[in-house]
A protein has these predicted regions:
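Short polybasic linear motifs
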Residues: 8
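Beta->alpha loop/short-helix hinge microenvironment recognizer with preference
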Residues: 15-17, 21-39, 45-457
Length: 457
């Protein structure tokens, strides 16, 4: 026991020594890299006005940096609409806390006053300021990036089999219940989970076949009106408890419709009590063949799984490309009608447009994406299943979601290539509230935090 304690003590000393060596090396690298870039800028200082201090000095930001701020301070059309009606939204609509939080984030997305990263070209001295983003799912820019990241994460879970995309819809008379009490949205997930699991269990009760399925809640239709429904991606097959896989090509949609109607109405009655019985009876009489459950005509091919999920499951409420016109009072937007794919152009007052949008902002920490069956459990027997994307390729696919690579793949240009000489631009410094935050300062903060943790331990 004594030799074990001695061994652990010496091991901790070695780890502590190497930890300090790595941090010291990182500090030296930062200082060396910064000096190299500063020297390069000093050689190229003729490109700057001689009366303007160099961007990298510690006296101030200089005129050149101010011009960069002015160049980047622009709003997209959605930010303009919400900025114009901000007071009216806040004091007449009385939005929920989560709505107001996301509106504030979206309006200030890309605002240089909230900080960003400065890049410079060591070859010609050209500067580029990249502002921080808001990371709100409500923001069309950040929401799209969030969708890309979630689509990639979801695709990593999928088994290498064909998947069926089913959509579970509800009676129009039930929609207001979910709008008034958003906790009821959980009932949709519970109902779909029980129905899909039951359908596969009935294939062979002794084998207990379990599918893999993921569910995404959409609260909006194409016209932006409140229409909660579940998109569900279901594996065309199930895995038994003894490790046997069974392919399932036929889905019983009659069963799915009736079972989903029954499961959802029972869930709602248990939450709402006896006051819901009249509505429940009306739903049964109006929908004798069950709630509408349909499958998308094109299946989710394992080879194109990320693209498929991103297109159908992970999209934000509205893209700015769908907003055609805003004149300060009216907003014109377009969509393809779901029933017949007809192109529809709609013009409505700006406040009505805002109301339609903000109601789709979920409560904080509410999970819009959930996993069921094989994708929700972690059993050793499930590790034998082959995934669509092998674990060794996860890092490669995640790299496409980094902001630089995402812009390059989406728009065909590299944001960190100098616009003047096409050389690679270098990261210089961070800025927050128009003030420089040096890498040395960040290093010192990290070191002090590390020392604090060691002393408390």
């Amino acid at each position: 026991m004594i030799w074990l304690n001695s061994y652990l003590f010496h091991l901790s000393l070695i780890c502590f020594y190497y930890h300090n060596c790595i941090l010291t090396y990182a500090h030296l690298y930062i200082k060396t890299r910064k000096c190299t870039i500063e020297a390069s800028y000093a050689q190229q200082k003729s490109v700057f006005d001689t009366s303007t201090p160099l961007p990298l000095n510690h006296e101030g930001l200089g005129l050149s940096f101010s011009s960069i701020f002015l160049h980047n301070s622009f709003m997209n059309i959605l930010q303009k609409i919400f900025t114009d009606y901000y007071e009216e939204i806040k004091y007449t609509l009385h939005p929920r806390n989560s709505e107001m939080e996301n509106i504030d984030k979206m309006i200030n997305c890309g605002n240089p006053a909230f900080g960003g990263a400065m890049y410079g070209c060591p070859h010609c001295g050209n500067l580029k300021f990249v502002p921080f983003r808001c990371h709100s799912r409500f923001c069309p820019t950040c929401g799209n990036k969030y969708s890309m990241e979630r689509s990639t994460s979801m695709s990593f879970k999928l088994i290498n089999v064909q998947h069926r995309h089913c959509v579970f819809t509800i009676d129009e008379n039930l929609r207001d219940f979910f709008l008034k009490d958003r906790s009821l949205l959980n009932c949709l997930f519970h109902s779909v989970t029980s129905v899909v699991s039951r359908m596969f269990f009935k294939l062979n009760k002794s084998k207990n076949f379990t599918p893999g399925f993921l569910m995404v809640l959409h609260t909006f239709g194409r016209d932006l009106k409140w229409n909660p429904h579940i998109h569900c991606l279901i594996s065309e097959g199930g895995y038994s408890d003894d490790g046997f896989w069974r392919n399932v090509k036929h889905f019983n949609y009659t069963y799915l419709r009736n079972a989903f109607r029954t499961a959802l109405l029972n869930e709602l009655e248990s939450c709402l009590g006896s006051s819901f019985k009249k509505i429940k009876a009306k739903c049964y009489s109006d929908h004798k063949s069950g709630f509408y459950v349909y499958a998308k005509p094109n299946k989710c091919d394992p080879k194109n799984v990320i693209k498929y999920i991103g297109r159908y499951l992970g999209r934000p409420v509205i893209a700015t490309s769908r907003i055609d016109k805003y004149d300060g009072e009216l907003v014109t937007f377009h969509y393809n009608r779901h029933e017949d794919e007809k192109y529809v152009v709609e013009t409505i007052p700006a406040m009505d447009f805002i109301k339609r949008l903000i109601r789709h902002i979920p409560e904080k920490h509410f999970k819009m994406i959930r996993y069921g069956g094989l994708y929700a459990r972690h059993r050793s027997i499930d590790s034998k299943l082959h995934r669509t994307i092998h674990k060794s390729k996860h890092h490669f696919y995640r790299s496409f979601n980094q902001w630089r690579t995402a812009i390059l793949s989406s728009f065909g240009y590299d944001p960190l290539l100098c616009s003047e000489c096409s050389h690679q631009m270098e990261f210089l410094e961070l800025y927050y509230n128009h003030q420089r935050v040096s890498l040395e300062e960040l290093y010192e903060k990290a070191m002090s935090k590390s020392r604090g943790k060691r002393s408390s331990a």
